[in-house]
Amino acid sequence: MSIDLSRIPAQPKPGVVNVLVEIAGGSRNKYEFDKEMKVFALDRVLYSAVVYPYDYGFIPNTLADDGDPLDGLVMMDEPTFPGCVIPARPIGMLEMIDSGDRDEKILCVPVDDPRYAEVKSLKDIAPHRLEEIAEFFRTYKNLQKKVTEILGWQDVDAVQPLVEKCIKAYKG
């Protein structure tokens, strides 16, 4: 199965992004989309005894400062699968440094899940849940001897300008 990223809009409508899942929540397997083969390939298995807290992937047709598409993490009660496109509402972002590069993780909720209908910003998420997410990204590369640094959370107002910037950067 080949995936044509050009057919997946980054932002199908205002306030919504498409997140293409690379890694299902609860998994240690780190898949990445191979642009040449247009399929998902196993990049590595996490070295640590941790799992991705939620479905993790990227917003197609964006280009972030680290040279990759903008990362997205979608809070869901059930994991999906690599290759699933989730229309998602951004609610904030985790700013971090990964291997010396700035790296933002856009935290989203699924548009089509009524359990998250009232979740509009980070203020609607328990602070402990946000700490769990930050802790995952703070420590998931420790046994690889790679350094990540958490800079902090930014609320929903900071997300749209970044998404627009990354769409523009992708278009060149």
From Swiss-Prot:
<feature type="binding site">
    <location>
        <position position="66"/>
    </location>
    <ligand>
        <name>Mg(2+) 1</name>
    </ligand>
</feature>
<dbReference type="InterPro" id="IPR008162">
    <property type="entry name" value="Pyrophosphatase"/>
</dbReference>
<protein>
    <recommendedName>
        <fullName>Inorganic pyrophosphatase</fullName>
        <ecNumber>3.6.1.1</ecNumber>
    </recommendedName>
</protein>
<dbReference type="GO" id="GO:0005737">
    <property type="term" value="C:cytoplasm"/>
</dbReference>
<feature type="binding site">
    <location>
        <position position="56"/>
    </location>
    <ligand>
        <name>substrate</name>
    </ligand>
</feature>
<keyword id="KW-0479">Metal-binding</keyword>
<feature type="binding site">
    <location>
        <position position="30"/>
    </location>
    <ligand>
        <name>substrate</name>
    </ligand>
</feature>
<comment type="similarity">
    <text>Belongs to the PPase family.</text>
</comment>
<feature type="binding site">
    <location>
        <position position="103"/>
    </location>
    <ligand>
        <name>Mg(2+) 1</name>
    </ligand>
</feature>
<feature type="binding site">
    <location>
        <position position="71"/>
    </location>
    <ligand>
        <name>Mg(2+) 2</name>
    </ligand>
</feature>
<feature type="binding site">
    <location>
        <position position="140"/>
    </location>
    <ligand>
        <name>substrate</name>
    </ligand>
</feature>
<feature type="binding site">
    <location>
        <position position="44"/>
    </location>
    <ligand>
        <name>substrate</name>
    </ligand>
</feature>
<feature type="binding site">
    <location>
        <position position="71"/>
    </location>
    <ligand>
        <name>Mg(2+) 1</name>
    </ligand>
</feature>
<dbReference type="InterPro" id="IPR036649">
    <property type="entry name" value="Pyrophosphatase_sf"/>
</dbReference>
<dbReference type="GO" id="GO:0004427">
    <property type="term" value="F:inorganic diphosphate phosphatase activity"/>
</dbReference>
<comment type="function">
    <text>Catalyzes the hydrolysis of inorganic pyrophosphate (PPi) forming two phosphate ions.</text>
</comment>
<keyword id="KW-0378">Hydrolase</keyword>
<keyword id="KW-0963">Cytoplasm</keyword>
<comment type="subunit">
    <text>Homohexamer.</text>
</comment>
<dbReference type="Pfam" id="PF00719">
    <property type="entry name" value="Pyrophosphatase"/>
</dbReference>
<dbReference type="GO" id="GO:0000287">
    <property type="term" value="F:magnesium ion binding"/>
</dbReference>
<keyword id="KW-0460">Magnesium</keyword>
<dbReference type="GO" id="GO:0006796">
    <property type="term" value="P:phosphate-containing compound metabolic process"/>
</dbReference>
